[in-house]
Amino acid sequence: MRLRLLVSVGVLLVALLPSPPCRALLSRGPIPGARQASQHPQPLSFFQPPPQPQEPQALPTLLRVGEEYFLRLGNLDETRAAPLSPAASPLASRSSSRLSPDKVAANFFRALLQPRRPFDSPAGPAERGTENALGSRQEAPAARKRRSQEPPISLDLTFHLLREVLEMTKADQLAQQAHNNRKLLDIAGK
């Protein structure tokens, strides 16, 4: 019992102590796989905070889209929009005017972060044009009904499966403990 406690305390200490950032992530070169000179010639101390780079680092962003969560690293505030031309498709030939996948993903997440209007509010002129292009407004309740009939996916299902696995593991541990107790009683009874 004490051994488990000591091991768990050791794991928590290692996990919660500050550590220097990975040098491979700090030194991204223009050529992937090429070695670069270290930006920080002195060795990093374990308790010393890492030196701040010249450019501000992009903080990870947790985005919620429906029931799914995405972790996005990068700047979501860029104003350049992703082109909707055939050149932007992955099957198109490579061209110099094409955006990188990171910029396309950033544009996608920025579009997801834009405020949405409620379903009951009247649509503006620009939104009416997109509604006419996508279909009439009467199809929305039918689509919502179809979606509600589908089985839950994503986080709800993940946590449900996780709970079931944990319950099965707990039941297995209890059965194993009972078996071990029976063995001990048989040995002690002899």
From Swiss-Prot:
Residues carrying Alanine amide: 188
GO MF term set: corticotropin-releasing hormone activity
Keyword Nuclease: no
Prosegment residue ranges: 25-147
Job description of the protein: Hormone regulating the release of corticotropin from pituitary gland. Induces NLRP6 in intestinal epithelial cells, hence may influence gut microbiota profile.
Signal peptide location: 1-24
Keywords: Amidation, Cleavage on pair of basic residues, Hormone, Secreted, Signal
PROSITE patterns to which the protein is assigned, alphabetical: CRF
InterPro entries: Corticotropin-releasing_fac_CS, CRF, Urocortin_CRF
Primary location: secreted
UniProt region (Disordered), positions on chain: 33-57, 116-151
Protein family according to the UniProt entry: Belongs to the sauvagine/corticotropin-releasing factor/urotensin I family.
Name recorded for this polypeptide: Corticoliberin
Annotated organism of origin: Bos taurus
Subunit: Interacts (via C-terminus) with CRFR1 (via N-terminal extracellular domain).
Cellular compartments annotated: Secreted
One of the GO biological process terms: negative regulation of epinephrine secretion
Pfam (any one): CRF
GO cellular component: a single term: extracellular space
Keyword Secreted tagged: yes
Tissue expr: Produced by the hypothalamus.
